[in-house]
Amino acid sequence: MTYYEEVMKLMDEIWETQFGIIKEAAGIFADKVRADKLIHVMGSGHSHMIAEELFVRAGGLANVNAWLDFNLIPTAGARKTCKLERLEGLAKIIWEEQKIDTDDVLVIISNSGRNSVPVETALLAKERGICTIGITSMKHTKMTESRHSSGKRLYEVVDLVIDTCVPHGDGLLHFNGVQGGPASTLAGVFIVNSIVAEALSILNEAGYELSVYGSQNVDGYCNEDYYRRFKNRITHL
């Protein structure tokens, strides 16, 4: 099988097994838009790319606050980031930099679902009664132990779990025992954009005015109204 063929199989599996949960998440997103609340999203390591995909994105919702902490992004140093995402207490520091309301929703992305930062972030949200959505690989996480002192993995803490269906180890292909062709980023981006698309469909069918970013590379399109509206609520705007 080629990488293309394996990716198509994975997308089909996600759609067939997770569509109902994606629709449920989309309903939550739509509710937050109607209520003028924020959709927060975070991920560490390569999962930050999935969080960033939702942020100030052409065709994406305007009320998204991505938690883009530099310490959790590989450009800060790959080995350093690996150590920091396992560090208990860091999530609390990052949390305190955000403007999150109890009526907002928080999406936490972690393919393994085992590291301290995503687990601790979910626990902090749970303590405060904030709705959480976890995006994780159930095939991977159920074969690993938590690195957080609670013993919990992400899927055991969040309110709603969306399975990326990615295999343990991430790679879709095998070469004499070596895994290649990682899939977690593709799967995560597909899932979050599917949630947004379904949320937009819900809002559109209800006749609600859509707050959606346009491409900054299309002449005549201006997002300044959204920047002004959210500049005091979204950290990295």
Regions found by a protein language model. Give the residues of each.
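C-terminal functional extensions of proteins
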Residues: 170-175, 179-237
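Glycine-rich phosphate-binding loops that contact phosphosugars or nucleotide phosphates
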Residues: 41-196
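Conserved, well-structured ligand/cofactor-binding cores
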Residues: 4, 88, 92, 231-237
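Short active-site oxyanion
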Residues: 36-39
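Generic N-terminal amphipathic, Lys/Arg-enriched alpha-helix
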Residues: 1-17
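Short, surface-exposed alpha-helical recognition segments that flank or form part
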Residues: 16-20, 82-85
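A short, well-structured juxtamembrane/interface segment
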Residues: 17-32
